Design a protein with these regions (language model features):
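Short acidic-aromatic low-complexity motifs
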Residues: 1-30
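Short beta-strand edge/turn micro-motifs at domain boundaries
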Residues: 95-117
């Protein structure tokens, strides 16, 4: 379970990191080159798609951070947990659940489920 927790932490850290070379490097180390990102507004693929998804969230809701808000649950290569999104000193603006599919230590699929307001 420690390895899974490490992957989830690296995933959330990547989504919270600012644009730049460090985020590009983090994306390459956490996600498979052919990663699929399924979000309510559409599907993206690959490292470039991951960068686009992160950049879109950060530009839409600047100053917010994702935090895990529930236990990590695992079934074979599927990992899921609840999250909240908000500013460090403010209220949460969204909540939901991530579903990750793993291949070894790489995330090959990320599906984002956003709770209804």
């Amino acid at each position: 379970m420690e390895a899974i927790e490490s992957i989830v932490t690296a995933h959330l850290d990547t989504w919270n990191s600012p644009a730049g070379p460090e985020r590009v490097q983090a994306i390459a180390s956490v996600y498979a080159p052919d990663v699929v990102i399924g979000e309510p507004q559409g599907t993206l693929t690959g490292h470039e798609g991951m960068e686009q998804a992160i950049a879109a969230l950060q530009s839409q809701l600047p100053g917010t951070e994702l935090s895990r808000s529930g236990p990590i649950q695992v079934a074979q290569d599927l990992v899921t947990y609840a999250w909240t999104l908000g500013s460090p000193d403010g209220p949460r603006v969204a909540s939901g659940r991530d579903v990750l599919f793993l291949r070894g230590q790489d995330v090959v699929g990320l599906y984002v489920v956003v709770d209804a307001p």
